Amino acid sequence: MLSLSAWIQVAGAVQLAIGLANLPLAIRLQYRRNLAGASEIVRQVFYVHAAYIVLVVFGFAALSLLFPTDLASGRPLGRFLSTFLAIFWLLRVPIQLFYYPAEIRRQNRLADVVFTVAFAFLTVVFGVAATR
């Protein structure tokens, strides 16, 4: 059985994969074409927010890969960060399941299942670390 620190490192690898999967999204979802009718400020805010979300996910991955023992320690900072990460990923589960249109989820069933399982896994790992 893996230690909690090892599970956190696995979670870091999962977060890294999520971040990497988001990199080609602008092309795949045709951001430029789909945002063409939006005002310039809306396009700019959209691109900035999308980039920052990916940056944050990469930051979570780095935190998990480089400092797993701190996150698993049960000390206040580790518990706080683990709680935040657990809540962040927990909130992502219902977004995946209920916010995105069912038809789009069906068209991309494998990706939908992989991401949903990943978000649930991350919630559990960081939830366990938060309760130590």
Which functions belong to the PLM regions below?
Residues V124-R132:
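Juxtamembrane boundary at the C-terminal end of a transmembrane helix
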Residues L55-F60, A118-V125:
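Hydrophobic cores of alpha-helical transmembrane segments in multi-pass inner/ER membrane proteins
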Residues A13, A17-A26, I41-T69, T83-L91:
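Core segments of alpha-helical transmembrane spans in multipass integral membrane proteins
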Residues S5-A6, A38-R43, D70-L81, I104-F115:
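Non-cytosolic membrane-interface motifs at loop->transmembrane helix junctions
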Residues M1-G19:
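Hydrophobic transmembrane alpha-helical segments in integral membrane proteins
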Residues W89-A102:
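Transmembrane alpha-helical segments of integral membrane proteins
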Residues L25-Q44, Y99:
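Cytosolic, membrane-interface loops and tails of multi-pass inner-membrane proteins
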Residues F46-A51, T83-L85, N108-F121:
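Individual transmembrane alpha-helices with interfacial aromatic-anchor signatures
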